[in-house]
């Protein structure tokens, strides 16, 4: 599994893990928001990954205010050598660790942290998750767009559970106060985003189930052909009907607007989250095999 870093700080970094496609299928790229890996690993552990050296050197983590906040949790997860993720179990926050069934060999995730400690961790992560949606997700899309036509087709399997939920419950951005619980439930059903730019289109389908989000970003020629020329971003309104949003700027590199998470209109509240992407991206990568660090989501 190859490993690439896209980003320059805790809030805009995405870790891209690439798996070789089976039986002629395109390689699968798994983007994971980087803030969980960066915040829940001590600096020495992070330095065991060559790909992270430049990022760690530039961050000065030891004095970073957000990094300091998570000292207790770094101690708690210090013995974790496999992937962890955040999840909601029966509506309650939980931290899960990847495990292997000794009888069948199948991989599953078991709860390793629940209750108040998990809830406190989620509250600490909420504002960081919102910042990732605002600056990290647009940067990732910009990176993916730059790869189209220069590399073989990849299938981007993007699991950002439960960042959307974290972001929409972040004080003072509590969407329950703005649109009510019915609006929250509608938001958790289905959202489709189409990003169009010139002759290239990136299709991102966010299928929102329960309190989590799973999405697939496809950049194959077939997907491009199917959606080229579409000038819209689509989302569902609070009645479940698809509605178009005219792309505000055909130059993708200059401006990217995402209807995440501000899907619904509210009095005196902006509907759009607007993020400007820089022309230069800080990207580093290598091809070390397997993943040993605590990985996000």
Swiss-Prot record:
Topological type in the membrane: Single-pass membrane protein
Keyword line: Host membrane, Membrane, Transmembrane, Transmembrane helix
Region (Disordered): 275-297
Basic and acidic residues: compositionally biased ranges: 288-297
Transmembrane segments: 191-211
Localization annotation: Host membrane
Signal peptide: none
The UniProt record lists the keyword Membrane: yes
Main location: host cell
Regions of compositional bias (Polar residues) in chain numbering: 275-287
A GO cellular component entry from the record: host cell membrane
Protein name, per record: Uncharacterized protein VP9
């Amino acid at each position: 599994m190859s490993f690439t870093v896209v980003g320059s700080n805790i809030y805009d970094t995405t870790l891209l893990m690439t798996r070789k496609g089976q039986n002629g299928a395109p390689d699968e790229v798994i983007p994971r928001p980087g803030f969980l890996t960066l915040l829940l690993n001590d600096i020495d552990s992070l330095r065991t990954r060559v790909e992270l050296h430049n990022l760690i050197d530039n961050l000065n983590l030891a004095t970073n205010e957000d990094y300091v906040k998570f000292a207790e949790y770094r101690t708690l997860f210090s013995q974790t050598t496999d992937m962890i993720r955040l999840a909601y179990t029966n509506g309650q926050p939980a931290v899960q660790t990847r495990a292997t069934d000794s009888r069948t060999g199948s991989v599953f995730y078991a709860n390793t942290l629940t209750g108040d400690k998990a809830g406190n961790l989620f509250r600490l992560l909420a504002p960081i998750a919102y910042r990732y949606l605002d600056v990290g997700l647009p940067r990732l899309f910009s990176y993916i767009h730059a790869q189209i036509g220069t590399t073989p087709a990849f299938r981007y399997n993007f699991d950002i559970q439960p960042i959307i939920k974290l972001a929409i419950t972040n004080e003072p951005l509590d969407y329950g106060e703005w649109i009510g619980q019915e609006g929250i439930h509608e938001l958790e059903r289905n959202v489709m985003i189409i990003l169009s730019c010139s002759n290239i289109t990136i299709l991102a389908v966010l299928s929102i189930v329960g309190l989590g989000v799973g999405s697939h970003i496809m950049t194959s020629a077939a997907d491009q052909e199917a959606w080229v020329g579409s000038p819209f971003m689509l989302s569902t309104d609070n009645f479940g009907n698809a509605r178009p949003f005219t792309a505000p700027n055909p130059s993708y590199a200059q401006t990217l607007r995402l209807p995440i998470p501000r899907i619904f209109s509210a009095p005196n509240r902006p509907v759009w989250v607007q993020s400007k992407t820089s022309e230069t991206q800080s990207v580093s990568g290598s091809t070390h095999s397997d993943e040993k660090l605590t990985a996000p989501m």
